[in-house]
Amino acid sequence: RATAGAAAVAVRGPGLLVTLADPEPAADDDPVGGGGDVDPRGLVSDSDLQRVVNALWASGAEAVSINGHRLGPTTAIRTAGEAVLVEFRPVTNPYEIRAIGDAGAMSEAFLANPDVRALGTISRTYGLRFDYSRQEDLELPAAPLAELRLARSVADAEGDAAGASRAPASPADRDEPGAAP
């Protein structure tokens, strides 16, 4: 369970599928330009995704992904310019958030969450598309492993330091003026 929560392994099981999407543009009469305006308050933002993800974790999710990108304990969801990023990878509309866990219990707690109810209001008022469903079988990938550039294992560091001078263990081990030889 710890490796699943840390996103270190792929997981499979029942859960919830939540979809957030920008509103459909209003129809207009312009045959050349096509499409109408969309109220920007209905566009999916990084904070909307954060709210859904946090509500899923609070509802008992054991593993979560956004558009196939697995979320771990330190995953950042943020905006850079017009793009929504999960870690440093852009994700695009529509946003599929998958959460593995007890679908029945999660569904009830998820819908009772105040942030989820607020998204329902935004959906009705500004057209943000918001849908969720219980799923019998979801599969989430493992998160990519972090690349260590400078860190080494303790065993490697000790092997490299054999024969090299060690740091003094106590002030008495230091060569300081007035210290006993």
Feature-to-residue mapping (PLM):
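Core subunits and conserved enzymes of cellular information-processing
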Residues: 1-181
